[in-house]
């Protein structure tokens, strides 16, 4: 159609204008000039494809990945060779290493027989040690024997447990995420306060206390400018943007830079992103009147796993990993028992959010349990604080399934209610239009917060975006737009009279040139 031709010519012109190299531009122009000017009726398609095949996104990404892999391999080879060459001339370090290994194996990890001089000689051969906070006995108890101690998952660590390792280091680097699960204290707040008052150290509780503290909080308090001095590791590569997009919006305040490209994701049979399955279940107490279980919801989870295993565990998808996360231990145990009886428990990890802290799976199922019968306090506990929900939904790399009572969960006033409404939004877009869902994904990556299917004075629009007082309506035009141009123009004028800008985006542009669409949206919203 004429509109498709116009779109194609405009897209080619935009792409042509971005070519920086004049010689290359002239070469491509030899084939594209008539097309760009609009004079060519019969396009030389084969010649055009040949000229630009080196610039296809897949080819460019493949070349970049190949260069990255080569650089990584070369870097490791150089470092390895330099290390081996240096070690081959250091006889004292080799002898010390042999002696330490002998003592380590004989004494089951204890190093009490090793003197500081031998240990320091050994460190020249093995300068990097990886250990847990519970295993410092494998390292010589001497001050400052390590130049740097790196503490990972610092919000899970108490200062008390880390003191033996901190004692051994000159400097420490603390890595953590305060939006993840906190450490579980071994003393109550009241007991700790009583001890602090008894020994007159009340003023140190905020900095060095155990019950309401962790290594990350203490480290922040030690920085000269507190939170201002934190170095943010904000680039996120793990999760599909529709999954991490919720947490970025509602928990991380848009600080994350989403780097996983939905156009080049690992395609899996059941689809990528977020899915919702509604189950009107009921809650009851677990064994010995502890915890909570929602059996109809758990049964639906097991059915879903059976379907997923049938679709995603054969051929090229046989390596996909799966997990089920739930807030309640009784629900975890019920699901595990049922999956075992069905012969499906193998290669499916089931647990609470604490089980999955620091872990990830290709496919995750979130079973919130909240439904009729649960107490108000138990339902509130699921979402307050928000860390439990955040960990539960961000373990998924490719696909996240919410299986639960959507109405009951949506009625919650905190993060659970917001998440269910987000799931509903994505599910509605998935059922309506692939291009709308794709554009929503790209807008989420950009950090936008689009309202979807908004009704403005009886006129329903696809998306509404706001920025510094500007209001932009974005409409994704499919084939039906060609038959309703006059009506659409009338709608646009009506919306403009109400103070909205209107941007119409061809569905084909969303499929083929999403970056250009996002650029147009940013321009309309007057982003710098």
Label the predicted regions.
Residues 254-337:
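Conserved helicase/translocase motor-coupling segment
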Residues 145-146, 168-171, 224-230, 274, ...:
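Short glycine-/polar-rich loops that comprise or flank the Walker A/P-loop
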Residues 455-493, 497, 506-512, 523-525:
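Short beta-strand-loop-alpha-helix junction that forms the active-site gateway
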Residues 109-252:
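ASCE P-loop NTPase helicase motor core
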Residues 188-231, 340, 373-454:
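Helicase C-terminal subdomain and adjacent C-terminal extension
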Residues 135-136, 155, 178-182, 188-190, ...:
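Conserved nucleotide-binding/hydrolysis micro-motifs of P-loop NTPases
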Residues 307-394, 405-411, 419:
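Conserved helicase C-terminal RecA-like lobe
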Residues 2-145:
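Conserved helicase NTPase catalytic core signature
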């Amino acid at each position: 159609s004429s509109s498709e031709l116009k779109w194609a010519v405009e897209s080619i012109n935009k792409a042509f204008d971005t070519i920086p190299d004049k010689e290359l531009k002239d070469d491509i122009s030899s084939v594209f000039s008539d097309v760009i000017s609009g004079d060519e009726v019969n396009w030389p398609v084969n010649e055009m494809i040949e000229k630009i095949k080196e610039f296809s996104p897949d080819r460019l990404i493949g070349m970049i990945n190949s260069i990255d892999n080569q650089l990584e391999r070369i870097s490791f080879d150089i470092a390895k060779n330099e290390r081996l060459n240096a070690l081959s001339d250091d006889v004292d370090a080799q002898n010390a290493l042999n002696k330490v290994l002998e003592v380590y194996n004989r004494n089951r990890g204890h190093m009490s027989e090793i003197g500081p001089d031998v240990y320091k000689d050994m460190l020249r051969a093995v300068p990097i040690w990886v250990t847990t906070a519970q295993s410092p006995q494998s390292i010589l108890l001497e001050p400052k024997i390590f130049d740097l101690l790196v503490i990972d998952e610092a919000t899970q660590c108490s200062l008390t447990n880390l003191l033996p390792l901190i004692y051994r280091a000159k400097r420490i680097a603390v890595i953590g995420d305060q939006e993840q699960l906190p450490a579980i204290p071994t003393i109550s707040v009241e007991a700790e306060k009583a001890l602090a008052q008894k020994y007159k150290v009340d003023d140190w509780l905020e900095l060095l206390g155990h019950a309401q503290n962790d290594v990350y909080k203490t480290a922040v308090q030690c920085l000269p400018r507190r939170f201002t001095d934190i170095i943010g590791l904000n680039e996120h590569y793990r999760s599909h943007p529709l999954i991490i997009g919720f947490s970025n919006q509602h928990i991380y305040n848009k600080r994350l830079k989403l780097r996983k490209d939905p156009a080049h994701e690992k395609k899996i049979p059941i689809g990528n992103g977020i899915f919702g399955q509604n189950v009107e279940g009921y809650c009851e107490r677990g064994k010995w009147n502890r915890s909570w279980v929602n059996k109809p919801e758990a049964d639906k989870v097991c059915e879903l796993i059976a379907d997923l295993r049938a679709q995603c565990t054969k051929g090229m998808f046989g390596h996909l990993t799966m997990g089920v996360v739930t807030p309640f231990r009784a629900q975890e145990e019920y699901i595990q028992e049922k999956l075992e009886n069905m012969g499906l428990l193998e290669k499916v990890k089931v647990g609470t959010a604490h089980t999955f802290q620091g872990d990830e799976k290709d496919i995750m199922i979130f079973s919130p349990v909240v439904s009729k019968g649960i107490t108000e306090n138990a339902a509130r506990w699921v979402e307050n604080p928000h860390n439990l929900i955040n960990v539960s939904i961000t373990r998924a790399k490719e696909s996240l399934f919410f299986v639960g009572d959507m109405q009951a969960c949506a009625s919650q006033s905190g993060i659970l209610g917001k998440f269910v409404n987000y799931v509903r939004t994505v599910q509605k877009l998935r059922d309506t239009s692939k291009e709308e869902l794709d554009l929503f994904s790209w807008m989420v990556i950009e950090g936008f917060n689009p309202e979807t299917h908004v009704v403005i004075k009886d006129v329903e629009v696809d998306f509404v975006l706001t920025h510094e007082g500007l209001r932009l309506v974005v409409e994704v035009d499919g084939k039906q737009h060609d038959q309703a141009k006059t009506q659409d123009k009338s709608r646009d004028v009506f919306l403009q009279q109400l103070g909205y800008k209107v941007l119409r985006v061809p569905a084909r542009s969303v499929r083929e040139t999403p970056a250009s669409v996002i650029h147009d949206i940013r321009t309309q919203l007057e982003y710098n």
